[in-house]
UniProtKB/Swiss-Prot annotation:
Compartments it resides in: Cell membrane
Name of the protein in question: P2Y purinoceptor 14
InterPro entries given in the database record: GPCR_Rhodpsn, GPCR_Rhodpsn_7TM, P2Y14_rcpt
One example of a Gene Ontology biological process annotation: hematopoietic stem cell homeostasis
Family in the record: Belongs to the G-protein coupled receptor 1 family.
UniProt keyword annotation of Transmembrane present: yes
Keywords assigned: Cell membrane, Disulfide bond, G-protein coupled receptor, Glycoprotein, Membrane, Receptor, Transducer, Transmembrane, Transmembrane helix
Length: 338
């Protein structure tokens, strides 16, 4: 997991354009933070009223929590990268905040994979009942996912235990001991592997569902396939989000990690890999703004509760306007009488 906080490259002497790393990227993260906090706050409020009656709803609720926690790390990155905060902020990002960011990003990725598996099982294997579709199993699996991700990530916090050599130029890799640098590299490879496995499974599930829908349509040519088509579109939307938000970062991730931990890269190469990593990571962070849209299209109970809350709000507003109009009419009538 990349604990690089200041977006300065690790080995000196290397210099680069700070306009990108200290101004443009922090501003963009600030925009993502505000938008994501608003959308995920609303999503969390809506899901509070949605019963956990199905596996995929449980998985969606876990994604809401992961996105919200991930979004809370953005202000620290903004303060650290822009130089607006004290040097202790950069140390905190290296040791804690960046780890939380990546844990929650991969938790979200895994749960999207589980949602796709749930949809696949429901459509392609509808006659088979399985414990993996039970609510209790989904809750247990959710706990195991969080525990696994924390198990992989927490050593990055513990092993980032070296003192700060220069407060004006804090490099995250310099805060790690020897074992910490090795774990950093190994955990990166593990997390990247998890992503590519989930992404390939998404493609397999989507392909299988599409084939099933096509065969059902040829056999029946009835509206009974409309629900399956909707599920296919839902999984396609998840695949699309993966392609836009996560694939670019995971293409850039491995070469950037190697440039951090190996010494034979030129400054120009390090700079290029740094910019590639930062902008693709920003795309991954922007996923917290897209997930609430997926909730709306993927989860019917979510839509129902949202519509109910909106109608209640509109009703209260209309009642207030009617009450205000009645009071004004009563005042006018009393004035006319006088």
């Amino acid at each position: 997991m990349n604990n690089s906080t200041t977006t300065d490259p690790p080995n000196q002497p290397c210099s680069w354009n700070t306009l990108i790393t200290k101004q443009i990227i922090p501003v963009l993260y600030g925009m993502v933070f505000i938008t994501g906090l608003l959308l995920n706050g609303i999503s969390g409020w809506i899901f509070f009223y949605v019963p956990s009656s199905k596996s995929f709803i449980i998985y969606l609720k876990n994604i809401v929590v992961a996105d919200f926690l991930m979004g809370l790390t953005f202000p620290f990155k903004v303060l650290g990268d822009s130089g607006l905060g004290p040097w202790q902020v950069n140390v905190f990002v290296c040791r804690v905040s960046a780890v939380i960011f990546y844990v929650n990003m991969y938790v979200s990725i895994v749960f999207f994979g589980l949602i796709s598996f749930d949809r696949y099982y429901k459509i392609v294997k509808p006659l088979l009942t399985s414990i993996v579709q039970s609510v209790n199993y989904s809750k247990l699996l959710s706990v195991l996912v969080w525990m696994l991700m924390l198990l992989l990530a927490v050593p990055n916090i513990i092993l980032t235990n070296q003192g700060v050599k220069e407060v004006t130029k804090i490099q995250c890799m310099e805060l790690k001991n020897e074992l910490g640098r090795k774990w950093h590299k190994a955990s990166n490879y593990i997390f990247v592997s998890i992503f590519w496995v989930v992404f390939l499974l998404l493609i397999v599930f989507y392909t299988a569902i599409t084939r099933k829908i096509f065969k059902s349509h040829l056999k029946s040519r009835k509206n009974s396939t409309s629900v399956k088509r909707k599920s296919s579109r839902n999984i396609f939307s998840i695949v699309l989000v993966f392609v836009v938000c996560f694939v670019p970062y995971h293409i850039a991730r491995i070469p950037y990690t190697k440039s951090q931990t190996e010494g034979h890269y030129s400054c120009r190469t390090k700079e290029t890999l740094l910019y590639a990593k930062e902008f693709t990571l920003l795309l991954s962070a922007a996923n917290v703004c897209l997930d609430p849209i997926i909730y709306f299209f993927l989860c019917q109970p979510f839509r129902e509760v949202l519509n109910k809350k909106l109608h209640m709000s509109l009703k209260v507003q209309n009642d207030l306007e009617v009450s205000k109009t009645k009071r004004e009419n009563a005042i006018h009538e009393s004035t006319d009488t006088l």
